[in-house]
A protein has these predicted regions:
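"A position-specific structural signal for the A-helix of alpha-solenoid helical repeats
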Residues: 11, 55-58, 62, 105, ...
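Short, small-residue-biased leader/transition segments that mark boundaries at the very start
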Residues: 1-2
Length: 206
């Protein structure tokens, strides 16, 4: 019940933050911390990780989301990177000890603020750890799309053109984008559980 109760507070904190209700998000964050700091969290095991280790990942994730919605973007990125570090340090589990890769949020919010190269690095790293992860596929596609526009001098048609300052670079981006889009489309249309349209790498992104 400890992990379940904490997870409910975690989910509510993220939901309130992304609905713009920062005070409610902070209240849920405090309630989450009550469970996270419970001494029993160190003694309880969920598969291969302690509950304390799992909840330690969630704490900077919550604070990072809240900070971002408050406009404190650099503080948010620092917190989310800390959450990524903690998640990467969890013991191997099958299924994963934490089912939501923090990189979804980190990459998506970096991209939202125009940090295209940093976001691309985040998504590529996640795809190495979680091959064909549709959320990171979408994030990487969005990064490449933005790079394509920059390469074309601000064009928005998504196709290589004679005005491109670097035709070979444009061609490489277009080719990879098409491959990723095919992979994502096949994945989302071939399974009975793929019934949700992924529009962003994370639901926290606008």
């Amino acid at each position: 019940m400890l992990f379940r109760s904490a997870s409910l507070r975690y989910a509510r904190a993220l939901a309130f933050a992304n609905l713009g209700n920062i005070e409610a998000a902070k209240a849920e964050s405090k309630a989450f911390d009550v469970h996270r700091t419970d001494p029993e969290a160190e003694n309880r095991i969920l598969h291969n990780n302690t509950v304390a280790a799992l909840l330690a990942v969630d704490a900077p994730m919550i604070r990072g989301e809240i900070a971002f919605k408050e406009g404190r973007h650099e503080a948010a990125f620092k917190l989310l990177r800390r959450a990524v570090q903690l998640q990467d340090g969890l013991h191997y589990d099958e299924p994963w000890g934490k089912m939501q890769p923090i990189r979804h949020a980190l990459g998506g919010l970096l991209l939202e603020q125009g940090h295209v190269e940093k976001a691309e690095e985040v998504f590529r790293t996640d795809l190495k750890r979680h091959p064909k992860n549709p959320w990171s596929l979408k994030g990487l596609i969005d990064c490449l799309s933005m790079q394509l526009k920059q390469t074309q001098g601000g064009g928005s048609d998504g196709l290589a053109c004679c005005g491109s300052s670097n035709p070979s670079e444009t061609s490489a981006i277009v080719t990879e984008m098409k491959e990723l889009e095919i992979l994502l489309t096949e994945q989302r249309t071939s399974g009975e559980f793929a019934d949700y349209e992924i529009r962003k790498s994370c639901a926290c992104c606008y």
